[in-house]
């Protein structure tokens, strides 16, 4: 068994900085956090407490990283744009407060190297042109127009392949597709060699999709690249029904880190909502909810105003017996009561519909 001290030393050697493995008691997500970081709150859910996790830590090293290009100051500007149009915001859904709570974090991808050796068969498609004539009746006469059509000639091909591929990108988190859908794609071509100097107290998500589980995705990538290489070797323009029987050897798994900010706010019911920000392009991913309580208070206020106008209208109507000019005030009060009464439920309805659109 590896002791916690030895594991801590191994992590420090692997990552070039002092790190400690932790996991969240609430969301069960595992992280590597800087040894000097005193926060006990989970950077993933902001609800759970972090506890040390001295074992079951992946030892695949970091190889590449995409650096942060969005500063915390720019994050606040992105938040200001993000919350525009929300009329009734919860107290904590404030750009300044959200930006002050941001944590730097990195999410992992697998980089897979390996050698593929085997045999393949496929239908290779070759473009060729067919010339024909097309008759058209124009301006009282028949005209002939030449038409060139591109068609595909399919040929069965077989062969062998022996290739080595490097840095095939494979998800390392079970929720990777969900995260990228919300955060937007990263420009992986801007990745640089891993440097602990660029981490700056950032937490690191521990892969939840282990190499054994991620292998089918990696194998698919190997096969895709093999199909492209076989297509190029056959000088074909198209490939279909590609089947390969191969051995996948000399595999090496490392990590590519993607930058992300995390923050959170509590809604009026005390529920914590985590907000994620793409550290490269500033895309914001999370729920922005309106305060239904504030909306209901405004609706009740408008309803009370409408009722008050109606009461004044009645009083003015009674007063017309003594002062006819009060009839005009009575009519005005009734019209105001009607207009305000119609608009009274609008704030509550808007907040309800807005929150439904965030699901």
Regions found by a protein language model. Name each.
Residues 40-43, 57:
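Conserved glycine-bearing catalytic or ligand-binding loops at nucleotide- and phosphate-handling centers
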Residues 270-291:
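Juxtamembrane amphipathic/hinge helix adjacent to a transmembrane helix
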Residues 16, 58-271, 290-297, 305, ...:
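Charged, low-complexity helical/coil segments in non-catalytic cytosolic or luminal regions
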Residues 24-27, 42-45:
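Short cysteine-rich clusters marking metal-coordination/redox-active sites
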Residues 17-21, 39:
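Residues immediately within or flanking Cys/His clusters that coordinate Zn2+
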Residues 1-14, 32:
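N-terminal cysteine/histidine-rich coordination modules
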Residues 33-34, 51-52:
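Short, non-ligating residues that shape and space the ligands of small metal-coordination modules
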Residues 10-11, 30, 97-102:
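Catalytic micro-motifs at enzyme active sites that drive phosphoryl/nucleotidyl and oxygen chemistry
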């Amino acid at each position: 068994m590896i002791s916690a001290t030895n594991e801590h030393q191994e992590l420090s050697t692997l990552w070039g900085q002092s790190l400690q493995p932790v996991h969240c008691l609430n969301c069960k997500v595992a992280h590597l956090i800087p040894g000097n970081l005193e926060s006990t709150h989970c950077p993933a859910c902001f609800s759970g407490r972090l506890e040390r996790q001295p074992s079951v830590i992946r030892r695949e090293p970091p190889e590449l990283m995409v650096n942060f290009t969005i500063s915390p100051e720019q994050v606040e500007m992105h938040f200001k744009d993000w919350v525009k149009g929300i009329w009734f915001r919860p107290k904590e859904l404030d750009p300044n407060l959200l930006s002050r709570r941001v944590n730097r974090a990195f999410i992992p991808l697998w980089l897979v190297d390996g050698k593929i050796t085997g045999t393949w068969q496929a239908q290779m498609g070759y473009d060729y042109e067919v010339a024909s004539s097309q008759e058209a009746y124009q301006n009282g006469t028949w005209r002939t127009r030449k038409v060139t059509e591109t068609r595909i000639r399919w040929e069965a091909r077989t062969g062998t392949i022996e290739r080595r591929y490097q840095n095939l990108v494979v998800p390392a988190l079970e929720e990777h597709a969900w995260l990228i859908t919300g955060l937007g794609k990263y420009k992986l071509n801007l990745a640089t060699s891993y440097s602990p100097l660029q981490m700056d107290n950032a937490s690191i998500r521990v892969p939840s999709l282990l190499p054994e589980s991620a292998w089918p995705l990696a194998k698919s990538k190997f096969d895709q690249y093999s199909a492209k290489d076989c297509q190029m070797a056959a000088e074909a323009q198209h490939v279909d029904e590609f089947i390969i029987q191969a051995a996948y050897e000399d595999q090496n798994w490392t990590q590519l880190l993607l930058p992300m900010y995390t923050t959170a706010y509590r809604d009026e019911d005390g529920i914590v909502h985590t907000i994620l920000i793409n550290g490269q392009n500033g895309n914001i991913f999370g729920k922005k909810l309106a305060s239904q309580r504030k909306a209901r208070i405004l609706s009740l206020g408008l309803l009370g105003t409408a009722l008050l106008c109606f009461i004044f209208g009645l009083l003015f109507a009674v007063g017309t017996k003594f002062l006819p000019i009060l009839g005009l005030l009575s009519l005005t009060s009734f019209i105001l009561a009607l207009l305000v009464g119609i608009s009274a439920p609008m704030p509550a309805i808007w907040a309800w519909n807005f929150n439904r659109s965030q699901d």
